[in-house]
Structures are given as C-alpha cells and as structure tokens.
C-alpha cells in the first residue's frame, strides 16, 4: 500500500514539475520540524484507516454479502466521495477522482483480502501529498512539509485548484 501511493504521488509530482503546472522547493528544516513531520505518518494512517474500515472493511463487505460485488464497490466508493463534499475547494472532478480512488481501494481489498494494504495506501497518499510534497490534502493544507509546492497558472481541472492534486485530471 505504501509503495502504491509513493509511485502514484511521485508520478503526479513529476508531471506537475515537468509540465510547469507547479513547482517544488525543498524547505530548510531543522531536526525538530523534520521529526514532527515524520511523526505525523501514524496519524495519517489512523485518519485514512478510519475511512477505509468504515467504507471498505465494513460497508463494502456487508453490501457484497447481501447483493453483489460490483454494486458494493459502487456504493462504498460513492459514499467515500460524498464524505468529501464538505471539504474546501471541492469540485465535481475532485469528487469523481475520490470515487475512482474508492473503486481502486475496493479492488485492492477484494484482490488482496487485506484492509491493512488499503489503510497503508490511503494514509500514505494523504501523508505524501501534504507533509512531503506540500499539496493540499482534499482541500486542507498541511501545517508542515518537506517541500513547498507553488501552483502555476492554469484551470482548476488541470492544476487541482484549492482542492489539491486530487482535483486534477492528472
């Protein structure tokens, strides 16, 4: 799960940097803020894990037991997207992307039979976005990050706008 998110966010960051959608600058950090940033990872696992246990570990499996797997993935993924509707900067594209990520998470759960892999993917995704790369995380800024991200100009569907990378077509 960790590797999946590292690759996903690494590709997104590379595309942003190379295409000029945005740029990254390494922050000058002393040991104290660096340890603080590294120490945030377990909290992202807890946050992402809570969402995954509720929408995939519980809801998806209950619906699949009563109906069928495609419907269970569709419903749990849609609920996952709906849970983000109140976030700052939310757009149709950002919710669609979150629903699609929910489908990926549902498939990962089904094919690996491991909620822990899905929790690791979700928590790492959020952590890398916010505390490593300096992106907004579903419309919320991180207090501290290894890199600072500066958004270039362009339409929100390309840059992600105020919602962050999850609101982009990339």
Where are these regions (language model features)?
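Membrane-interface helix caps and helix-loop-helix hairpins in membrane proteins
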Residues: 21-27, 83-92
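Juxtamembrane helix-loop-helix connectors linking adjacent transmembrane helices
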Residues: 1-53, 60-66
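Alpha-helical membrane-inserting segments
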Residues: 7-19, 46, 50, 79, ...
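Small-polar-interrupted transmembrane alpha-helices in polytopic inner-membrane proteins
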Residues: 9-10, 40, 44, 68-85, ...
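Hydrophobic alpha-helical transmembrane segments
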Residues: 2-3, 34-38, 42-50, 70-75, 92-99, 155-170, ...
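Functionally important transmembrane alpha-helices
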Residues: 94-157
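Membrane-interface helix/loop boundary segments of multi-pass membrane proteins
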Residues: 50-75, 107-114
């Amino acid at each position: 799960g960790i590797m999946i998110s590292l690759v996903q966010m690494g590709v997104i960051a590379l595309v942003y940097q190379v295409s000029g959608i945005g740029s990254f600058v390494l922050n000058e950090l002393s040991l104290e803020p660096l340890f603080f940033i590294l120490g945030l990872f377990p909290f992202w696992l807890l946050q992402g894990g809570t969402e995954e246990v509720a929408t995939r570990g519980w809801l998806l499996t209950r619906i699949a037991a009563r109906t069928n797997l495609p419907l269970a993935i569709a419903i749990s993924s849609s609920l996952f997207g709906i849970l983000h509707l109140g976030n700052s900067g939310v757009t149709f594209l950002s919710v669609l992307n979150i629903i699609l990520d929910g489908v990926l998470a549902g498939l990962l759960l089904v094919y690996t039979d491991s909620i822990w892999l899905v929790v690791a993917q979700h928590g790492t995704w959020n952590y890398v976005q916010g505390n490593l790369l300096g992106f907004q995380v579903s419309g919320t800024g991180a207090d501290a990050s290894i890199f600072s991200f500066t958004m270039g100009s362009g339409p929100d569907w390309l840059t992600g706008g105020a919602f962050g990378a999850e609101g982009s077509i990339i």
